[in-house]
Amino acid sequence: MAQLSFNAALKMNALGNKAIHDPTNCRAKSERQMMWVCSRSGRTRVKMSRGSGGPGPVVMMSSSTGTSKVVSETSSTIVDDIPRLSANYHGDLWHHNVIQTLETPFRESSTYQERADELVVKIKDMFNALGDGDISPSAYDTAWVARVATVSSDGSEKPRFPQALNWVLNNQLQDGSWGIESHFSLCDRLLNTVNSVIALSVWKTGHSQVEQGAEFIAENLRLLNEEDELSPDFEIIFPALLQKAKALGINLPYDLPFIKSLSTTREARLTDVSAAADNIPANMLNALEGLEEVIDWNKIMRFQSKDGSFLSSPASTACVLMNTGDEKCFTLLNNLLDKFGGCVPCMYSIDLLERLSLVDNIEHLGIGRHFKQEIKVALDYVYRHWSERGIGWGRDSLVPDLNTTALGLRTLRTHGYDVSSDVLNNFKDENGRFFSSAGQTHVELRSVVNLFRASDLAFPDEGAMDDARKFAEPYLRDALATKISTNTKLYKEIEYVVEYPWHMSIPRLEARSYIDSYDDDYVWQRKTLYRMPSLSNSKCLELAKLDFNIVQSLHQEELKLLTRWWKESGMADINFTRHRVAEVYFSSATFEPEYSATRIAFTKIGCLQVLFDDMADIFATLDELKSFTEGVKRWDTSLLHEIPECMQTCFKVWFKLMEEVNNDVVKVQGRDMLAHIRKPWELYFNCYVQEREWLEAGYIPTFEEYLKTYAISVGLGPCTLQPILLMGELVKDDVVEKVHYPSNMFELVSLSWRLTNDTKTYQAEKARGQQASGIACYMKDNPGATEEDAIKHICRVVDRALKEASFEYFKPSNDIPMGCKSFIFNLRLCVQIFYKFIDGYGIANEEIKDYIRKVYIDPIQV
């Protein structure tokens, strides 16, 4: 009978023992029982290894002969005398008893669900009320509107918008400044306060407010030099405001060195603008009110939007009105004052940005499934205004905005809209750098975050996406290292998106991270700070927390069922395998309550596949593997009398499960699908036999041969077909192969699984005699290539495969149920995260444990 080499056995056991005897690995020690015993003759020492699964057969490895024997724990009777390998994997971190003790009130009480239902209705109302944008008042912009003059009948000037002046008079804070009381940013407060003091001084009113405001400015102006960051275009706008304040006789410390330095910087930038008077840089239009002395007011009118605004900025629009008397500017500002009750925001309209941001916010929080119709309406609206030039904050924005465009590209593509990444080319300067590279402020940082996230969805050969990634990733990593912004929430988001890009971001893990860092009093910054109530929303946060906990309670019940099944089936007693119920369950990456049957079937089948993988790799002989495979092909349990009893038990458990799941499939699909179900299992075990024959012959296949076989033996075929047939959607016979094997998307996801796995397991497999891996096969095809060369090549192949899989996933296919496509496509996530640093299935480490704890074990505080 064919045997693995003695040296391979020793190497494998040496590798396994390293995990057990490593003094730094206390968990591994405590979860393994290792005993040295003597035979009755006193001549042979035997090492006995048992996993954490409990009672069951023990594999005994003789130190003198290298052979192993399966013995009964209770009688120590030798069952066979065949050399076998024993894989000393780390023990199960989520033992049956741990899972069974989980309790949560969110499953038992209807109060939580009733409150969640109420919140869903309220948030739907918020979607339905979306208009041109809901945004907080801006003292800075309102003061600009208050400064606009008109000529009265006696020839004297008076405020054209007295309601704006009254708002400035009545909204000074206790410390003498103007701004959002709950959030202090020095740049924001100074811009708001200086301009408010100017507005009051122009009309010679509010003398006490002017005095208090000037006192605040004088006290804080000296601190400006200590600021780590300045708001966008501060160096253009603020010196111009100080010049106006000085002309009005407002007593301030104008000669501070830092103020002089700001003025010098402004003069240099004005020189650049003057030299390009016929072509003012678009990114400087936002600071138009700081450029008064160099603007040609006739030529500037070509930048006016349909709604009458200039770059959606009331301040800039008021400045143009002051210098031109344009009626469209007047009408817009008058309408804004009516809408916002005597004040104006820092930008308007923001209908596109608000819709995209709300959808993005809802989906980040993990509650998007409650608002499918509302999301579609919002995105249909955005898509109607989508342009190859890009989009701005509002539908009438004349100048596209990188942040809104990148967010739109990502969100629209995610939902299946046809949008080209070439739109990003509009945001590069002559050096190929994106506009957001200028300024180094967190407004630009937000743009780069969305640029990076958009690049996650790259298709093959999309140069614009590749350029975006090359620019955005180092930019964000540098931002994390240098802390160029004080925005804590934004940094937490950057840490997550860089650490877990889209192809690695498990939906529930992302939701947990976003909820934990969510700030329902969050402010954004343009020239000044502002709030968007639809985004910084306590109702969204409350629903997200409740929904997460309610769904988690269902997941806990499913995990209890699954660990109980694993134990009662006897599989927990099999000691040659890894016990990974919680990890396999996590791998489904499908959390919606309606897919409970899918998750349960996937996990049961997946756990058995982990067992089969270990059985084929380290336990079964070639002949036993062939017998087992023949039983699978014939769908017959009577062919198993020549294989060990533990393998017979595994087969019977598998066979029973197949019958049970097929019965469930019949109920959903309305017909017997067994013929479809058997095919991937036959392919799967045939590949195991092929791999073992190559191993026994010492043959390393070519890279192409390797992929054809090993991409199947990774096991996605058998473990996904029945689950997708249980998703509640009818899958026609001819559609099965379009979504499952051998569809392009399925093969690409399988390829990414196989090769990503190889990069973290090949050394361990090589040590136990399994020479064939993607790394080894590439090196065989390319003499002289190093392991490092092979890994780099494999990473490129995986990157390409994921891009092609994305293209296949988003490609329109009306006959394929979207739920089925999503289930297959989302399986790419778990392999990327499980094999990010180590073999996350073979070594049940603390990082994986932390993922599972966050998603399934620990509820969110409500």
From Swiss-Prot:
It catalyses: (2E,6E,10E)-geranylgeranyl diphosphate = taxa-4(5),11(12)-diene + diphosphate. Keywords: Lyase, Magnesium, Metal-binding, Taxol biosynthesis. It comes from the Eukaryota. Pathway: Alkaloid biosynthesis; taxol biosynthesis; taxa-4(20),11-dien-5alpha-ol from geranylgeranyl diphosphate: step 1/2. Its cofactor is Mg(2+). Mg(2+) 3 binds at N757, T761, E765. This is Taxadiene synthase. It comes from Taxus baccata (English yew). The lineage of its organism: Eukaryota, Viridiplantae, Streptophyta, Embryophyta, Tracheophyta.
